[in-house]
């Protein structure tokens, strides 16, 4: 027989950003627990709101699976004497296994004890397993509540634990399990009875609790969409805000509010940021994408007195927007260039000078990158824009608007630059320098934006590393991993020919780190290599292929290209032989220095054929052609060479020439991958 398990943990309101992870961890821990205890089940799912995390296990067996174990003991000669009687060793082994010596099995010269363990009743096991499950949930900022010697993110108020219709009894954190849950704080604050897992969602809904997050999400989206339509527009529903609101409410009701049209004269982000990031309101936009003087918010409750709720939200937003208007007006009393002077009083990082000095470095670094991107053919306008964008890049950090709303850094710089009459390219680059701001964010799209963003990120990485503040473990206070990943993704998307070593060299020069240049190159390359590894993993690249191509990361944008090529090579016919040929070359060549190859010293036609095959492959690579056919031909030439030629010729000049030929081929192959890292079946 099978029954369903319902386990609800009732708490004070848990922070919205924690709930998705809590529910995911709860499901994974439950699955692991059930498997470890030999409890078969059909399905595990979790449901939750800010005040409750619920686990439902359908089709949970009523007993553990029986298990038969067979344990090998001493040899027969040691376990029994010549008359077949158990010795002390044999009797001791049998006693340890809980069996009679006569039950020992003799096989292959050893004795074995076969033990049958009957499964325990699930209802009995759950009394200890459920408390253990709660204790195992990994939570940030867990703490003790009251005088209890128990830690959780918020105080636990109740447990519902039902196996079928039977209560699973236990006490944890001073709370005893039962079948009573609690309804919505204001709409149905009384306790209510849950009879079974099948009854759970319906019982919750009667108490104004929409416990299924996906159903609650659909309700929120539908209500927001309909409410925005009534306002004459479309709501801007961002995934992050929707996820946060989802775990702020148990019974969602969307409502609209409005604000004075005069605030629409502010830059759109200056209105949206206090609305969305500070008040958790959804902006409403017209069909042309312009902002409307309306917003949508989601109430944790019903439809009663919505006008009062809307008025309260409008009052709060009005104060926020009035602040934004004030800061904007004050900021506009100076140009962005004038604001920049104040950067002299702002510390970049301890030991790295001021933000003003940082912009001086960025001016040189961005200009150098623009010249590199243009292959030394950048025109005067491009170079002037590069200097100007870098010069003004951090000026908005000292404005009132960004001081109050830090999320607007770069965005207000762009807006103020446009109002000051700066070129659109300069203004957009000021915004794009911070991209990507978060995982999945868009990357810089303009050449100047790419240059300034790359300059800013490499300056941050090299500067912070120079002070010994390299991220370790989970500690990354300056967000260098995110910035390095952003740099990698940006260079890959742009198919940039920029070399990482050139960026580091220029940054070291500007920081006056010449004596630490070589160490810095190694540190930064290793740091970028890990970010590239993450990128390749997300793209599904095999581990050994990652290892093969990550030896050289100087040309960042080329790494995924090389990985894709190696995977295609490994999928081709005869790939095992080809890889073995390349590895064979490396086994010999990597221990030698190499020199110039002199065809006049060739004694066998296979030497010339190998050189010719190498040149064809090298030419194909230089021309950007498909090199796979040429490298397959090179592999065959390598095999023929080794079959016919003795590399270690008695003539030292011939031997060195052959080693130089192999060294040249291996060096060229290493530019694509180290094939010795490839694991062949």
Protein language model features and the residues they cover:
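Amphipathic alpha-helical "coupling" segments that flank catalytic cores
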Residues: 1-681
